[in-house]
A protein has these predicted regions:
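Alpha/beta-hydrolase fold catalytic core
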Residues: 1-25, 46-49, 77, 85-91, ...
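Conserved HGGG/HGGXW glycine-rich cap/lid loop of the alpha/beta-hydrolase fold
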Residues: 16-63
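Active-site loop/oxyanion-hole signature of alpha/beta-hydrolase fold enzymes
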Residues: 56-96, 267
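Gly/Ala-rich beta-loop-alpha elbow adjacent to hydrolase catalytic centers
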Residues: 97-101, 105
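Flexible "cap/lid" loop of the alpha/beta hydrolase fold
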Residues: 110, 119-150
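Conserved alpha/beta-hydrolase catalytic His-Asp/Glu region
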Residues: 130-131, 152-213
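Conserved loop-alpha-helix segment in the C-terminal half of the alpha/beta-hydrolase fold
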Residues: 213, 218-253
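Catalytic histidine-centered segment of alpha/beta-hydrolase-like enzymes
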Residues: 253-266
Length: 280
């Protein structure tokens, strides 16, 4: 795996690249990092794809402006799009996006359809109305002073990550739906993210009216216990997109099925990519 940085107009982009072949762009969600894809990247490389995963604007080791007003969906998209341009990839892209990364992937397909071969959407965030009502109010009215989050230690984030991972189902042997190393990385990513990123959801465009214009083959995957986004919102994407060739739900998983059960999710991705590339 090659770790690299590139300087673009909107600042440094930290990313990793693994494998050779058709390009696959992997994009994480809010308050996460490129480590979301630590399980999928090696599989892609082993199957003959070139996987590229970045830290989004304000996340991980990428550019983090001090001014919270700079954190908008458009700014994140510009940073993401300029990074893709910097890679100088000749082949059309396969876009894999989780949550906010799914919204960015959809927006990229809308604006640059000729550059996109296929889409894989994991619990995609495409409309602020997917959030629980209390979070919609908080994000829209800027009730939260997110600067305070910068002073919270790792152990506080780890406590909330661990609590959200507990499996309360009767008869389940596992106490957590996410492995320990994933919970560690998730909490660490929260501490590394700029506090301004929580301003991004309020500027998220409602993509629903535009989705029917996306013609590329799409795989839709989601966790049925998502507490961050309404799981009932994901079938809307399936109905609106013109070419969803397959979809699958993961009953035990919440917002991050790619980390909850990668051994179950990754085969769906790899099968979809094989079908897409065979038909190309």
């Amino acid at each position: 795996m090659m770790k690299d940085e590139v300087m673009i107009k909107s600042g440094v982009v930290n990313f990793v690249q693994q494998g050779e072949g058709l390009p696959v762009i992997l994009t994480h969600g809010l308050a996460a990092s490129l480590h979301d894809w630590d399980d999928l990247l090696p599989e892609l490389a082993g199957a003959g794809y070139a996987g590229y995963a970045l830290d989004l604007f304000g996340h991980g080791e990428s550019h983090k402006p001090a001014d919270h007003d700079e954190y908008t969906f458009d700014a994140v998209f510009e940073h993401f799009s300029a990074w893709i341009d910097s890679l100088n990839l000749a082949d059309p892209l396969i876009l894999i996006g989780h949550s906010l990364g799914g919204g960015l992937s959809l927006q990229y397909a809308l604006l640059h359809p000729e550059r996109v071969r296929a889409l894989v959407l994991v619990n995609p965030f495409y409309d602020i109305r997917q959030l629980p009502p209390i979070l919609q109010i908080a994000f829209r009215r800027k009730l939260l002073d997110t600067t305070l989050l910068e002073y919270l230690p790792y152990r506080v984030f780890r406590f909330f990550v661990d609590m959200s991972s507990v499996n309360f189902s009767i008869g389940q042997r596992r106490t957590h739906v996410m492995p320990k190393h994933i919970r560690y990385q998730t909490a660490l990513d929260y501490t590394r993210a700029a506090s301004g990123i929580y301003n991004i959801p309020r500027s998220l465009p409602n993509l629903i009216p535009e989705l029917s214009r996306i013609q590329q083959p799409t795989l839709l995957l989601w966790g049925n216990r998502d507490q961050s986004l309404n799981p009932g919102s994901f079938p809307t994407v399936e109905q609106k997109l013109a070419n969803v060739v397959a979809s699958h739900t993961f009953p035990v998983c919440g917002h991050v099925p790619h980390q909850c059960h990668p051994e179950q999710l990754n085969p769906h991705v790899m099968e979809f990519l094989r079908d897409v590339t065979l038909k190309a």
